[in-house]
Amino acid sequence: MISDLNLDNYNYSLENNRIAKYPKSKRDDSKLLVCKEGKLINQKFYNIDKNIPSDSSVFFNNSKVINARLIFKNRNNTKIEILVINLFNKNYKNLLFNKKKVIVETMIKNIKKWKENETIEKANNDITLKVKQLNNNKVIFTWNKNKTWLEILEIFGKIPLPPYLKRDSLPEDLINYQTIYSKDQGSIASPTAGLHFTKSLINKMNKNFLIDFITLHIGIGTFKPVTTKNINRHNMHSEVISFNKKNLINIYNSNNITAVGTTSMRFLESIYLIGQMINEKYKNLNIEKFLYNKMSNKLTKKESMEEIINYMEKNKLNIMNLNTSIFILPGYNFKMCDQLITNFHYPKSTLILLIAAFIGEDWKKLYKFAIKNNYRFLSYGDSSLLFKK
């Protein structure tokens, strides 16, 4: 069992001038800090393939960010900002393909200026989008044309940049804040470790490594701060993961795994738990934040993949969609990942806790070195390659 942790032990001083508000002009020209067995090496990201073990398989999260930020004005011309934070229903159906109306969970800025029964709207040519509050942060959007919710968001929405960038999105963010391999619509934040990859770099890696694309649709938990004194009580929002048998076979055949980003890591560690749950006859395969504390975790990686493959064949499933709320804290026993490619994260965040779980106290040395050597931080910042300690 993971004991209570003091969040203050996962703090560091991050000055505003360290936060990269804009990306590098060339994606792979960012700095790369390699951390292996406590040793730190300055590199460039375009050389990352030379630093990953030759027998490693590399897993990328291909979820695509949608224009989830919408700005309306009420009757008094006051700005109301709405961030759509849930794009799936309880059966994992993607709501982006709804037509005429959709009910979604949101975060609302300036909500006190929006009367409960007031419908606010905006128009674009002959399309009118209306929205009204329901309850529990849910709203109903309706529109007058036979278009999908995705099409409506592309017309009216903006790319949801993280609040710590403290700027409005620009047209170029529509490209810069997506990975070049993004495919499956459904995230409200980018899997930013992947932003450094160019087409030529991926082509080069494809010749030297087994690479595969998995899906975890990123939700509000990515930038939701930890506000509880007891870290264990932090509410981890669930996120939808999607995978097929090919993904499982590739994991099965991998003796060494590199996760591109914390979301890929959370996907991979969640997949292991699904196999363990099937083995232990769980009926509900959704993953609670500390499920790993309740399980025997006795299966090997290969045995876990076999359990899921057999389950999919038995139930004639080509794809599985599930929710994960896995919360990785220091003391966690990693079952899947050997290396992690990741940016530099916000102090006292769930992502810092994950890094500390993966490389132990070396995270402090890593961040101290990065600050001293003028690394750029957060979503548009530089990157690191971490070897499990």
Where are these regions (language model features)?
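Surface-exposed, charge/polar-rich loops and edge strands
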Residues: 1-389
